[in-house]
Amino acid sequence: MGQFISFMQEIPTFLQEALNIALVAVSLIAIIKGVVNLYKSGLFQFFVFLALAGRSCTEEAFKIGLHTEFQTVSFSMVGLFSNNPHDLPLLCTLNKSHLYIKGGNASFKISFDDIAVLLPEYDVIIQHPADMSWCSKSDDQIWLSQWFMNAVGHDWYLDPPFLCRNRTKTEGFIFQVNTSKTGINENYAKKFKTGMHHLYREYPDSCLDGKLCLMKAQPTSWPLQCPLDHVNTLHFLTRGKNIQLPRRSLKAFFSWSLTDSSGKDTPGGYCLEEWMLVAAKMKCFGNTAVAKCNLNHDSEFCDMLRLFDYNKNAIKTLNDETKKQVNLMGQTINALISDNLLMKNKIRELMSVPYCNYTKFWYVNHTLSGQHSLPRCWLIKNNSYLNISDFRNDWILESDFLISEMLSKEYSDRQGKTPLTLVDICFWSTVFFTASLFLHLVGIPTHRHIRGEACPLPHRLNSLGGCRCGKYPNLKKPTVWRRGH
């Protein structure tokens, strides 16, 4: 250590010698050149590879390119399923045998058996939605019953009527639907079965051909072990679109913006993790993502953002609104959801191919600029998310598209800030400089000299060595072309 300190103290002294300076310069050049040669040889890269080989990369730092990363975003669906009256419905299947549905403060247990609890002679026959008012004194129960029958595809004017218990009786609310696959009721039973399969992904069909089968729905408490299955809710909302909204006017051709958890508009975008994301410290999806969603309607991520954004204001409004406005909410939500995407994912699920459950999304993030691609759904197969390697081509292409989009945007920005005239002047001046530099290197001669004599300026000589102006006679001496004087 003392030798190093002594050496540093002697630097100003030995640098006074020119030879020492030359030695220091040669040493520095040799060291730098040696490091560069080692780097170009690949030795450093080889040791880095040995140190990192076999280690796993976290999803947060999964590198695709130099400045692009593979990142994910997950939704928390708790904000959609609150306990407000007339809120979004919940559907649940327990042990593949018990079916439940919940809407607002009402909860029903749905069962199938061959025991007739209600009879046409003693109970209410339901042929129209207005007849449901004879079944219960609770608006929540009536509202949920009507919405459920609409969702399974029941036509109030063409399909067979069903029964409910008169609200004046003390036994409690219940309604009963004949789903027997017999006689003229067979077509309706198949239609009802199809509707139940769309609503409940694990629907157990206990009705046998040619046997009596009755569906009963009666109030019950919501089981605590029931999961919040938002996919069933999305299917439930879209099933009733033909009845609740015969003329769908929006068809996803509209613009929208994000709001915060209190419902206030934030045109500049809102950080989703503050109220509906599982992952913390996630970046904000601002005007860029919103603009992409306004242009691109074929995206599960955009559908979920629309549902989140609408649900906050809808719930706040519905607390003080009438039954008519409740129906309007159902119509509007149906217009917000992309039916094609839901049906496409449902078909994929039934065919045991990767499908989207609207929970986890991935996107490509540029670490330097902070720009990101539009999140895409992380597909599920066999009840588990696909590995990153299973859709490697997708995120590589998404990375290429992001880089291309960034370069295109940067080029457009530069084109907008730089006048074309200035670009032309710069280009032609560069061409002129290059041409003049070439001519300068070639060395074009400018005048004649008499060989072996001084420059004859200011006179100009002809090929005979005489003055071109005629002042001096021709000397008939050999001449040579010269450039300098």
Swiss-Prot record:
Residues binding Zn(2+) 2, per UniProt: H447, H449, C455, H485
Site (Important for GP-C-mediated membrane fusion) residue list: K33
InterPro entries in the record: Arena_glycoprot, Arena_glycoprot_zinc-bd
Keywords: Disulfide bond, Fusion of virus membrane with host endosomal membrane, Fusion of virus membrane with host membrane, Glycoprotein, Host cell membrane, Host endoplasmic reticulum, Host Golgi apparatus, Host membrane, Host-virus interaction, Lipoprotein, Membrane, Metal-binding, Myristate, Transmembrane, Transmembrane helix, Viral attachment to host cell, Viral envelope protein, Viral penetration into host cytoplasm, Virion, Virus endocytosis by host, Virus entry into host cell, Zinc
Phenotype upon changing G2A: Reduces membrane fusion activity. No effect on GP complex formation
Cytoplasmic topological domain: 34-58, 446-485
Region (HR1): 287-355
Region (HR2): 360-423
S-S bonds: C92-C226, C135-C164, C207-C213, C271-C284, C293-C302, C356-C377
KW Transmembrane helix (keyword) present: yes
Organism domain of life: Viruses
Consequence of substituting K33A: Complete loss of GP-C-mediated membrane fusion
Parts of the chain that traverse the membrane: 18-33, 425-445
One MF term in the entry's GO annotations: metal ion binding
Protein family according to the UniProt entry: Belongs to the arenaviridae GPC protein family.
Protein name: Pre-glycoprotein polyprotein GP complex
Phylogenetic placement of the source organism: Viruses, Riboviria, Orthornavirae, Negarnaviricota, Polyploviricotina
Gene name tied to this protein: GPC
